[in-house]
Amino acid sequence: MQAMLSDKKGRVLIIEPGLGYRLEKAQYSLITNYSILSPEITKPYIVSDDDRFERADELLKHCNDSFSVAEAFQILKSVKQEGIWATRVSFVYSVNENRVYYVENNDFEYVTKHQFCNSY
């Protein structure tokens, strides 16, 4: 299990209980179904041919500064998992808008958004 927390300053905290955490401030951040901090621990549990993290990472490396929420969802749609282990929720956080967008159960036609207040 892991969590990713982001703020409007572009900082990202990836937490993996029992393993630790990593603080990032990069153009983008990703997590997947296996451990980012210690991938060797979860390697035996990875579904064969699950290279979604690597494919998404490669696509994001080629994006420019005008990268949009819609483009982020195109990438997530292209790497979604289907079947018994289908992707249940895909999140995109926009630092510029201080807003989270998400899609449930691979229904990329219906994007829900949540606006955070700007109180700090």
Can you say where each PLM-predicted feature lies in the sequence?
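C-terminal, well-structured catalytic/ligand-binding subdomain of enzymes
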Residues: 4-120
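Phosphate-interacting basic helix/loop segments used at nucleotide- and nucleic-acid interfaces
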Residues: 1
